[in-house]
Amino acid sequence: WAANNLAMLLANQRPDDASSLERALILAQRFADSEQAPFLDTLGWVYYRNGDYQRATEVLERMQATGEMTPERQFHLGMTYLQGGRPGEARPLLVSAVAADQPFAGIDEARAALGSIE
């Protein structure tokens, strides 16, 4: 779990720092064969932060298939869809994430993204 938590922390706290994102990717790639939602979420979000939206989508859709969606995970998949040119699929995920009224890393980004879609 330590590698997962550090990778997510780096992706969330230093999204503009290339060396931090590279380290996050190295840490998260060990989860490529995982079937556990938290690990897939981290890997997908790290791909997203690195600008690899196709891989992010593939991994986060695997995460969604586990059925273990949380507001933060909905946000991650929604943002990935938005960056991938799929606003129609992004919107309900982002609406659900924000409407859950549970704080999560990125809630302000989710609200801003919704404003850009509507």
Task: Give residue spans per PLM region.
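Start-of-helix register in tetratricopeptide repeats
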Residues: 1, 38, 72, 106-109
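Canonical tetratricopeptide repeat
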Residues: 5, 42, 76, 110-113
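TPR/TPR-like (Sel1-like) alpha-helical repeat modules
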Residues: 82-105
